[in-house]
Amino acid sequence: WQVRVEDDGRALTCWKQRFNQDPAYRGDRTALTTLWSHHLVKRPENQLTGVGFLHGGYHLSHGQYMDGSGAFTVHRPEHWVFSNTKLQVNDEFGGKDTIVGYECDGCEIEWREGLPYPTGNDGTPTNFHILATASAKWHPDDSDWYDAWQPGREGCAVMGLYQQGGTVFTVGTTDWSHGLAKLNGTVDIVTKNIIDKLAF
């Protein structure tokens, strides 16, 4: 959420879903305190992280995908992120620990020859590598306040990375840490690969 500092620095304000009640709605709409990716703000978090909530949604939460696996499906197992995991194309991982859950961030995807690619239309860098995905969906009520979205629109959690000066890696889910309890489990190995590659 985009917030605004007010009251001489003593308060942070965010109108969130009630953005049309924000005083900025009648003036400089780029200062609206709502989603960064809202079409009136036009500063999608995808430009920084590669993913955002607009093309994500919920998984095992808010009544969406309540029978979901809680797992990611692998699309590019040859990537160094998956080194030492033995994962193959279309394998799932993390379901036993429900690593995909609650809020999920994604990006607009197009499929070419069986592989997902970012369209770049939502601010996601076109050199973003989509490594794994999981189904996600907005709650129908969310579409009531965000008029640019159709109710029932499907999204996904997206795990991936891109380089622009440095490397930005994202797992696109709030519940990734659930998989870290198992020493040498897949999530633990992937996390170690990332730290080993990017820490030095």
Model-found features: residue ranges?
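Extracellular ligand-binding/catalytic regions of CAZymes and related secreted enzymes
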Residues: 1-13, 61, 66-200
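Catalytic or ion-translocation cores adjacent to nucleophile or general acid/base/metal-coordination motifs
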Residues: 1-42
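Non-catalytic, alpha-helical, charged scaffold/linker segments
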Residues: 38, 45-53, 57-58, 63-68
